[in-house]
Amino acid sequence: MYGRLREIDEAIAAGREALEALEDAADSLDSAKRWGIVDILGGGLITSVIKHSRLGDANHALADARVALARFSAELDDVRGVAGLTAEVNRWNAFFDIACDNWLADIFVQKEMSDAADRVDEAIETVKRAVRRLEGARRA
């Protein structure tokens, strides 16, 4: 009984660690999207650089999340589908966005950021559900 509880506690801890990293990524993506809107409205080169910096922050957080999700998935099969998350923007679009700094490039990058944010939000919900089930199993 105590061994099972310990395993559940370890899985819950891994899930919470993954959630924290995913939420950090979501925050960075939200920041990048806000900078993206400013960029679309004529923010300029500095705005593009800040936006891509926030995307880099999101990718670092997602790398941390992948490690935590791998640990979590060793305990729980439900999260295997979210292990390949990334907030990468197509390199050509990133170059085009910074070098040309026009509204068309800004819109392409904004769409990629929104898609990445949607995937991260789905992963957060998947992990939250799994953690809630584990917490329920622990109480049972």
Predicted regions and their residues:
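A composition-biased, non-transmembrane "mature-region" signal
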Residues: M1-A140
